[in-house]
Amino acid sequence: MRVVLKLGTSVLTAGTDRLHRPRLVDLLRGIAEVRAAGHEVVLVTSGAVLAGWEALGFPPRERTLAEKQLLAAVGQGRLMHLYASIADLYGMPVAQVLLTADDFRDRTRYLNARTTLEGCLTRGVLPIINENDTVAVEQIKVGDNDTLSAFVANLVEADLLVILTDAPGLYTADPRIDPTATLIPVVERVTPEVWALAGGAGSHRGTGGMHTKLQAAEIATRAGTPVVIAPGDAENALARIVRGEALGTRFLAHGSRLEARKRWILAEIATGRLLLDEGAVRAVRERGGSLLPAGITTVHGPFERGHTVRLLAPDGSEVARGLTRYRADDLKRIAGRHSRDIEAVLGFTYGPEAVHRDDLVRL
C-alpha cells in the first residue's frame, strides 16, 4: 500500500508552542513500522514557520507574508535536520521536496515531481514534502498543507491519505461546546451537509482547520483515494489505520481511480468558473459530452487558455473540471453563441468546444 501521511503543526507541537521532539520520535517510529511491513510512505509536513519562530527566539508574530517567508526560510532547514536526525535512528534516509501550486499546474513540472517521488520510493527513501513558502506568493500558493497532501496523494496515486490532527475526527457538532456531539466514523461523500459540520479555522499555530481537511478529503476521494482524518496523539495511529482499524473518520473514495492525465487535471488549482445552463449540464454530466460555448451563461475569470476551470450547474454545484480552450476574455465574448460563430466573433478559433470531453473530469 502507498500511503501519504500529513502532519500538521498542532500534531508536531503536541499542544505546546514549539516542536515537540518526543512526538516527532513517536511519529517517525510509526512510519518506520509501516515501512517495515512493506508499505510505502510519503510525508507531507508543516512546521517550518514554527521552527523559524523558535530559532529566532519567539519574536512577536506579525503574520505578514514577508515575516512568514523569513521564518520559513530560517525554519525549513532546521525542520529537515530534525526529521533526518530522528529518521537516522530507524535507518530511514529522507529527501526534502518543496513544492508550489505551479508544480501541479504545469504538466512538465508535475511529471518531474512525480518522477522524483517515484525514485525516492523505489530506493527506500522517505520523501518529506512541504510547500515552498519562501517563494510562494499568493498566486502560486497551494494555501495549506491539507490541500497539498491531497494533491500529493493524487500525484503519486496513493492508496490512502492519512491526515493526523489535534481532533479525533469529524463530529456531528463541535464537541468543545456540544456535549451530545458524536464522532462520525464513515463519510461516503462530502455533501453540503458534511461541509456544514466543518466549523471555522484551525489553531493559532497552523493555517488549517477541519474545513481545509474536508477540502483535502473531497479532492483525494474524487480521484479515487480514500482519506482518514484521525487524532495525531493516538498511540501508533498510522500503523493502526494502515492495518484497517477504525480510528477517526474515514472518507470513502468515489469509484475507481482516475487515469493519470485526469488526475493531473483534478490536481491543478482551478483558476476560473463557468456557469452552465441545464442543457449543458445534461450534456456534460449524463452524456459525457464536451462543453460548447452555447451552454455557458456566465464566465468568472481571469484565466488563460489551458488553465483548469470549474463547471457549475445553475444552482452552483460543481459538475466537472476541465482545461479550457479559450481564455476568459474570449469566452465572455462567445458565451451563449453557436460554435459556428466563434471565428466571426474572435477572428480565430481553437475549435468548437470551450472544454473538450477528453479534457474533462466529471464530478
Curated annotation (Swiss-Prot):
The lineage of its organism: Bacteria, Thermotogati, Deinococcota, Deinococci, Deinococcales. Pfam families: AA_kinase, PUA. GO terms for cellular component: cytosol. It comes from the Bacteria. GO terms for molecular function: ATP binding; glutamate 5-kinase activity; RNA binding. Catalyzes the transfer of a phosphate group to glutamate to form L-glutamate 5-phosphate. Its EC number is 2.7.2.11. It is an enzyme of class 2 (transferase). It comes from Deinococcus geothermalis (strain DSM 11300 / CIP 105573 / AG-3a). Keywords: Amino-acid biosynthesis, ATP-binding, Cytoplasm, Kinase, Nucleotide-binding, Proline biosynthesis, Transferase. One of its GO terms (biological process) is L-proline biosynthetic process. It catalyses: L-glutamate + ATP = L-glutamyl 5-phosphate + ADP. Substrate binds at residues 46, 133, 145. The gene is proB. Residues 271-349 form the PUA domain. This is Glutamate 5-kinase. ATP binds at residues 6, 165-166, 207-213. Belongs to the glutamate 5-kinase family. Pathway: Amino-acid biosynthesis; L-proline biosynthesis; L-glutamate 5-semialdehyde from L-glutamate: step 1/2. CDD domains: AAK_G5K_ProB (cd04242), PUA_G5K (cd21157). It is found in: Cytoplasm. SMART domains: PUA.
